[in-house]
Amino acid sequence: MAKRDIIKNQFHTYKDTYTGTNVTRLTEPDHVSHHMYFYNNMMTSDGKKLLYSAELNGERQLYLMDIETGDAVQMTEGTGVADYSGMITADDRYLIYRQGERFMKQDLDTGEEECFYETPEGWSAGGDLGPSSDYKYMSIVETRKDTTAKRKVGGNWDAFAENCLAKPLCRIVYIDMEKGTSRIIHEERCWLGHTQIRPIYGDKILFCHEGPYDLIDARLWCINIDGTGLTCLREQPSDLIITHEIWMPDGESVAYVYKETTGKMEENIRMIPMSTMKEEVFMNCSPYAHFNVAPSGKYMVGDSQGHDVPIHMLDHSKEKDRTGEVKNDFIYIVDVEARKEIKLCYHGSSWRAIYGNSQDTHPHPFFTKDSKHVIFTTDLEGKPCLYMAEV
């Protein structure tokens, strides 16, 4: 298949057994498909088209789906397409994605492409792309190839701890996507990830020290875009899990999931306002593996994990649980103003890293533009598929 080819997805709608929510499967379980990394902007402004990845004919490419008809246009071709990297610019003009070490900008109308940045020889690009609100700038992490763990990170979790302990030389690069210029913001011997430019303000970059919770020094870090003001946002003892930090849409606070593995075993959503830099407990929550915030900031969504073992420590060689036991593998909605959690639907993910990318079965829920639906991924009915649940 080639760019601009069209595939047709057959939708299947059902009522969730446990909540009665209407859920529509958008892709079919005979092949792997998933949406982009769940912090990315992967829908057009009118909410009618969705960017996702599908593995067909042995390769993964990006597709743009009409969520009313199921028709999807192939947007990329060739090898090395980073299948979680795609995003649509705020003005709906361009598709941004990474292919190998090249960062591409594609005109959605004409299909014309240009490379606006390429990682230098000896370094590798990885992880997530962190754009500014206006999509003029982007932050990424580059890693010196000869400093990483010997085993490849990504296909499964085998090298997760190994790469953390290797303390690879990583750097945060700040890219001007319009001018094609770049500069190094920060560099250190530590596995870095999840760079996110502060919304609205654009003056800071949130990032993490990556790796198992009991091996890292602290996960949450922030730095000014000029490279000054490196700050650890929160100390982290080795028995505490902090995960999936995200800027609130107004850029005023960083939110994240806090989970104790000893003691009271508290699990809640916490925030750090930039005005005070002091942690606040927002509300208790179910055991989210990931969570996200609606563009309006009025709602949050999380994918609960029905077992206590961290995802990277699961035995992924085990077959999918077929006992029929229903654990707390549900999608939850949070009303931010009411600080109330509502069970939306069962995602039933196996959480297994067996399909080629360790993230493939992760639900990674996110809201549609109007906050009337939540889209997520799960292998509930076969290989990972895209689902859309009514809110």
Residue ranges and their predicted role:
Residues A2-T24, C164-C170:
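Blade/loop signatures of beta-propeller domains
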Residues R4-I6, I140-K167, C208-D217, K259-G263, ...:
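Short, conserved, GDST-rich strand-edge loop motifs in beta-rich repeat architectures
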Residues V32, M36-Y39, N57-G100:
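Blade-loop segments of beta-propeller domains
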Residues N40-K49, S85-Y94, R98, D128-Y137, ...:
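Blade-terminus and WD-like Trp-Asp/Gly-His loop motifs, strongest in beta-propeller folds
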Residues G80-C170, I184-E187:
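Asp-box/WD-like beta-propeller blade repeats and closely related beta-sheet repeat scaffolds
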Residues P237, E280-N292, R339-F366:
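Conserved blade-ending motifs and adjacent loop-strand segments that build the rim/top face
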Residues M283-I342:
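Loop/turn-rich, solvent-exposed surfaces of beta-rich toroidal or solenoidal domains
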Residues T361-V391:
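Blade-level signature of beta-propeller repeat domains, shared across WD40, Kelch, NHL, RCC1
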